[in-house]
């Protein structure tokens, strides 16, 4: 019995693992501040399609503000308007124009991986039994992060 136990122990301890240790890719989470999250009600007149983009300078920001305010004064509800673009960039996600309410879009996470800035967002739609308003809407989410020099990629979590 001892012989079987010793042989079994020798076999188990003597075997080397063929599993290679995986290289872990370091992900750096980026803190973001929401500038605004809500819905446009301009029936697309603002000229903002279903888009995901970044704003990296004051000129782009002013063009964007003029666009988003073309129907309603949307930027009046922004948490901040004066952005220091030498230190920050703006990330925007806009859903498609919808025929009803109860839709939403949200940036959930921003992280850097392999020198790429990754923006993870999620869309929400009404359930099959949920009562919705009959109004044309376009959900959006706008956030500010510290300036990063990396390329950016948008990832739809749905």
Map each language-model feature to its residues:
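Exposed, flexible binding/inhibitory loops of compact, secreted disulfide-stabilized domains
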Residues: 15-158
